[in-house]
Amino acid sequence: MATSMATAADARDPRLSKEAHATQQPTDVQIEQSILHADYGHDPNVSFEEYLYYANWTRDYEKTLSTKGRGMSSLLSVLSGKKQQAVVSGVPEPVTAPSIEARANDTSKKPDDAPTDTFGIISDYEWHHASRAARTATWGAVFYLITTDILGPFSVPWAFTQLGYGPGISLYFVFAAMAGFSGVLLWWQFLGLDSDKYPVKGYGDLGFRIYGNWFRYIINILQSGQFFLGVTLLIVANGQSLSQLSQGPKGSKAFCFTACLIIFTVAGFIVGQIRTMQKFGYIANISVWLNVFVILMTMGIVANSDPNYEAVYASYQIPKGPIKTSAGAPSDLTFIDNINGLMQAVYSYGGATMFCELMAEMRRPWDFWKGLIVADTFIFLCYIVFGLVVYSEQGQFAFNPAYQGINPYAWQTVGNVFGLITGLIAACLYGNIGIKVLYANVGRSVLRLPALESRVGKCVFVATVPVYWGAAFIIAAAVPQISNLSAFVGAAMILQFSYTFPPVLAVGFNCLRDAVGPGEGFDPATGRVVRRDEGLRRWVRGYRKRFLVNSFNVVYFLGAATTAVLGIYASVYSMHRQYAHANIKPFSCDSPTG
């Protein structure tokens, strides 16, 4: 995630002029990358057919690119933190783009709505090279980035305590398969709408180009909420780590839990003042391997020690007793408990939010499916192996996160220290991105603030960081229930990006694309779009072209939406129930780990 966001984080405002480009040699194109993040993708005057036209042109060019040494072998450059050099081999056949005059003479558009045409300043050649320079990632690198962003199996054993062996394995497999299918849907839409001229830079761009601004706003709001509550969850988890660390090997009285949350929050907004993320590259790679070590360590320790009965009783009110496992759903649990366990699977596969950003940096986005399938399979196997090992050894006493449920204090300390390091890095990255998303969608679009790279923008960023972290702390201290809170985040936000939005976007994409009949489409010579009808009739005609596929996606969408509603209800109900019967209270000194 850190790697994929580095370019956006460091982008500066372009200083472009006709004179500068008039003297520039065509072999030395120096266009700053921030121009690729401009609002050309949100121009309401650009039609769906125009996006399709230039996307087909870009895909045809990408077929000519060599793939030698661009697969799994490219992982070495990612692991070492080295940025691959962009290779732009030749220039595709020039396309006659609509001129400013042609757009101005187009009576189908209102003069007041005509956008400022930056393409009149930047030549097609320069635009092509500037766009290609930002695309260097390979499918091997994408496999690594998806894996490191999603891989985090520490809630899987607790999910098995709520589901049992059979339902747990089955549901994790189903959600892995459907997450892969959703990724393929997003990949297909990206190929059809992304181009060097109109690059797709994020999930919201797909929503805008298919359904309009209202859908983009929904996506941006949910993305902002996901990043914010991601920081909140990390504050709770690492507050628990600090609480366990403060107890010492003899189990003495721990620090006040709310104080532990404050300590991590203060550390977070101090480190979070780093505005750019390039410096996080090596640190983020180190944190990945620390995470892998904690996974292996936890599996080894649970096989040779007792569970942490004190922590389990403090959080779940399960008294010490014989270890039990269940082939099916445990008989002493309710449907609400099963749904909360299911939401851990949703949370575990929450990587679709970043798929568009990864494809936007790929040299050949067509190859994305390779990295997706390999990563999805690898992550599923890791989750199942880790979940089965820990659940088989600890049974109903499996804790969330799992490394806090091991009993030897020395190894528990190792897990907590490494967890603090990786958690602080992850929280700072999520906070950094979350603030930038808010600034772009509220500060820039609504309040008309200057660019983040400006002096005012930097001051606003610095002032926003403590407010952002302070708000996350308030929620963390008010709801210190990591399992129920993660279930809520999974149901309300992550499930939408991984399962609800992809099929509904696919239906819209198919309808708009298949509605284009003979003699219709975009004319690059005039900039006009020829359509013989508009409105509902056009959508119905497009839907019928792929009736079975579209109908399946509608059913998939309705199923995902229903699951989201059930998950939100179950998580909120469980929060209320735990407050009524557990020792965990808001803003309390009592720790969920005992």
Question: Can you describe what each PLM-predicted range is?
Answer:
Residues P157-G192, D196-V200:
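Extracellular loop-to-transmembrane helix junctions
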Residues F227, I283-W289:
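Cytoplasmic-side transmembrane-helix entry/capping segments in multi-pass membrane proteins
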